[in-house]
Every structure is written in C-alpha cells, then in structure tokens.
Amino acid sequence: PVVDSDYVIFVAEVASTCNEALLMQHLLKKTSDKKQRAYLINYFLEQFRTTLYRQTMFAEFELKMSELTAKGEIVNAETATKVYHDLIDLYFGPDIIHDEYIDLEWARIPHFYYNFYVYQYATGFSAAIALSQKILSEGESAVKAYKEKFLSAGCSKDPVSILKDAGVDMSTKKPVEQALALFNSLLDEMDELMK
C-alpha cells in the first residue's frame, strides 16, 4: 500500500550495501588475477574500515559527548578534541601515526550536527553483509525473502522486524560477527596476495 511505500535511512543503507556486497562477491568470484583480486579486496576492506569501524567510532564519540552533557559537564572544543583523540587511539591502535590535525576532525563531520544516527551506517553495513552472505549460501529462498520480506516491506514495520522477517536478527551479535568474519577472511586473502 502507498501508506507503507516510504522507507527509513537504515533500510535504504541495508539495501544498497547488500547489493554492493553481492556485486563485490560476484566480481571476486569471476577473477583469479592477483592484481584484480587485490584491488577488489582492498576496496571492500576500505568499505569495512570506513563504514563498520569508523562509523562505530563516530557513534561512540556522539554517545560520549551526550553522556558528558547529561552529567552537566561543560562540553567545549577542548573536551571534544580530547574525547576524539582518545577514540582514535582506541580504534586505530598505538602503531598508527596520526596526522597532527586529526584530533579536530570531529568539528568538520556534518553528521555530528544532526540527530544521533551514524550508528545506522555500521549496523546497516553488518545487516547488509549478513543478508548478502545468506543470499550467497542459501540461494533462491534467501533471494525471495530479500525481495518479498525486506525490499517490498517499505515502512510497514520497524527496520529490525523487517530484517528479522528476511532472516537477519539484529537483536543478536550474529550479523556483526558475520561481517567481522568476512573482514578477517578478506584480510587473510590480502595478506596472501601481498606475499
């Protein structure tokens, strides 16, 4: 029905990213050329880094800033810069050399000036990877569920329920674990290709 034809950003992210993941898996399946595989895997790994890891860091930054505000603490540029710096160290580790201005990156990210929503990119990416893996492993039955229970659902239910109907339960750790398992397998293959 027309009343349910709209969709929320989370659903749109899952749909587009699922299709991108399916295309990437298709391209990887079609080539054995080391350089082509390395290029494709690098591209896919960057999607993981920027969407799953980085957006999670952004969401944690938003959460920490909100918690400070809720406690009545003064939040200013100095506080935000310190919180962001600590998160960069946590997420990227001590071996990464940071650009001298990276601590100020928080000030130029437009997402931070809107409602708390960047977590949807990371969770949507995890859901999309889980859906794509389901389609690749189960075939036609998963494609049917993806089309009929996810893509066709619009806003007839909340996104988590729609995904559950399509076979991905976002109330569990499984979708994130599946995404991380794929990331690790891609990283292992990249290591082999670079030898």
Locate the predicted segments by residue:
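Long, K/E/R/D-enriched contiguous segments that form extended
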Residues: 45-51, 56, 64
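Catalytic Zn2+-binding segment of zinc metalloproteases
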Residues: 1-3
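Conserved short loop/turn motifs at secondary-structure junctions
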Residues: 5-8, 147-149
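Post-HExxH zinc-binding segment in Zn-dependent metallohydrolases
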Residues: 6-36, 44-46, 50, 124
